[in-house]
């Protein structure tokens, strides 16, 4: 359709007098009809123009539903309706350039490369989703909080920080956002009870501080095909006196690590190892311990999702405030279980892991088992699952099925029933109080978009970090 500006319309109806005289004779247009034509055009043209824009937006929505969001718990009609809501809610922020940041995981790569583009096309908001290291995300949040300057409009931050966010008073609780400045841009189909991990992002005041975006567990990983080989099972029983299988405690894990690294040594012409880990001096070495390694050994009190009063970090907590880490101050960070956990970490890394593991960090080590020379790993993040099922890699069968399996984490000698065992991590949307309201609302729309039911199942299949119960 040809769009005619108001200036062009004026020129078309107010011609030089000589032209008017020549035109009025053959057409005999009365003055009243001329006025009617002008008024009619002033109403019809904007309507037709708006219809054109609406049709264009509908086409964009349909394109994404048909080409990308092909797996969803919603029907196609429900998906279109939800995306139409996003397009309408975003109108006040159309044209804004919004910046959000997260750590680099397969799930967030999909968000950054695909979902940000979809959101931008559907809403008219230019969304930049940056990827960086988790330690850098923490530094950025800390800088915005302490320096009182806005760096980003939204963050995806580990739920481990719930205590810091609650105590700082600098984070805008999601509960307050959806009942306050963000009420008009909160998806009526958000369905909070459907989310996994809300307990992790809820403060002592029972307010939700962060909206879960993805979650993954830390579990035991092993080569099921090797564990089932008759020759290896026979040799293991001859050496250790019991069947080769999934270990339930650290002693059995150490036996299996020794078996593959020291006694088997080589399989199918390749050097193999009974253990994998990482040890480079890096921020990620911190969460190698904070992600419940100490409590797996038994350095915490009974309680879920955290031990109380001593949590899985070995820190004594009272009213959501840390009051002591050392034994002398009521903590467990230097207690027998923690010392044992540190000793096993160093010993196994040196004796049973590939030599290069000592110089690796979290990101570098995560995908190493996919190379096919690792028998087991006691501390493995399911966030790397997507890297472990790619066709053609050594740990995947020709039919696409995995040669590996996951199982619950083995427990250390100090562990008692009722203690936390293993680890679950939630990466969640976090918004600062000192951010601009309009920019924050636009970022809040994007946060809801990437966890919406229209999108979430496809995102789960891409990154394998499910966040909605309905998707599972």
Segments from the language model and where they lie:
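Short, low-complexity disordered leader/linker segments with a strong preference
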Residues: 1-97
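Hinge/lid segment of periplasmic solute-binding proteins
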Residues: 58-92, 159-219, 403-409
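Short, polar/charged alpha-helical segment
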Residues: 82-89, 106-126, 221, 225
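Extracytoplasmic "Venus flytrap"/periplasmic binding protein-like
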Residues: 114-194, 207, 229-231, 235, ...
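Short helix-initiation/N-cap motifs at beta->coil->alpha
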Residues: 132-140, 248-252, 356-371
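Periplasmic solute-binding protein
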Residues: 159-179, 195-242, 254, 277-325, ...
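Extracytoplasmic/periplasmic substrate-recognition and gating elements
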Residues: 202, 226, 350-353, 392-471
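Glycine-centered hinge/linker elements that transmit conformational signals in sensory
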Residues: 252-261, 296-359, 409
């Amino acid at each position: 359709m040809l769009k005619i500006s108001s200036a062009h319309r004026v020129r078309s109806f107010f011609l030089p007098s000589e032209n008017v005289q020549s035109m009025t004779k053959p057409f005999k247009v009365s003055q009243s009809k001329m006025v009617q034509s002008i008024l009619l055009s002033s109403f019809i043209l904007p309507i037709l123009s708006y219809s054109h824009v609406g049709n264009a937006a509908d086409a964009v929505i349909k394109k994404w539903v048909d080409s990308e969001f092909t797996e969803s718990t919603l029907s196609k009609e429900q998906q279109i309706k939800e995306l139409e809501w996003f397009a309408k809610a975003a109108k006040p922020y159309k044209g804004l350039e919004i910046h959000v940041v997260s750590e680099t995981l397969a799930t967030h790569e999909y968000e950054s490369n695909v979902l940000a583009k979809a959101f931008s096309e559907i809403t008219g908001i230019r969304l930049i989703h940056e990827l960086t290291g988790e330690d850098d995300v923490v530094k950025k949040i800390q800088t915005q909080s302490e320096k009182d300057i806005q760096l980003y409009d939204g963050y995806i931050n580990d739920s481990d920080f719930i205590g810091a966010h609650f105590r700082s008073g600098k984070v805008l609780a999601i509960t307050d956002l959806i009942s306050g400045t963000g009420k008009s841009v909160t998806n009526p189909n958000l369905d909070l009870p459907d989310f996994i991990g809300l307990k992790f992002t809820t403060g002592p005041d029972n307010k939700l501080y962060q909206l879960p975006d993805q979650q993954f567990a830390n579990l035991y990983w092993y080569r099921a095909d090797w564990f089932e080989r008759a020759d290896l099972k026979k040799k293991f029983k001859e050496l250790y006196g019991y069947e080769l299988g999934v270990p339930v405690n650290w002693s059995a894990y150490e036996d299996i690590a020794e078996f593959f690294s020291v006694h088997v040594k080589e399989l199918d012409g390749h050097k193999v190892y009974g253990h994998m880990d990482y040890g480079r001096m890096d921020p990620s070495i911190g969460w190698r311990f904070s992600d419940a390694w100490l409590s797996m050994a038994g350095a915490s009190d009974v309680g879920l999702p955290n031990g109380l009063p001593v949590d899985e970090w070995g820190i004594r907590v009272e009213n959501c405030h840390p009051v002591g880490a050392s034994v002398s101050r009521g903590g467990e960070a230097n207690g027998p279980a923690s010392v044992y956990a540190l000793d096993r970490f160093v010993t196994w890394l040196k004796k049973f892991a590939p030599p290069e593991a000592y110089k690796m960090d979290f990101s570098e080590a995560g995908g190493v088992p996919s190379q096919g020379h690792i028998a087991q790993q006691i501390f493995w993040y399911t966030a790397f699952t997507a890297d472990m099922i790619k066709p053609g890699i050594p740990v995947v069968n020709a039919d696409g099925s995995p040669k590996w399996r996951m199982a619950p984490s083995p427990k250390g000698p100090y562990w008692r029933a009722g203690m936390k065992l293993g680890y679950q991590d939630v990466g969640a949307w976090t918004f600062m109080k000192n951010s601009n309201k309009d920019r924050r609302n636009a970022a809040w729309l994007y946060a809801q978009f990437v966890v919406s039911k229209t999108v979430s199942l496809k995102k789960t299949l891409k990154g394998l970090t499910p966040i909605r119960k309905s998707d599972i």
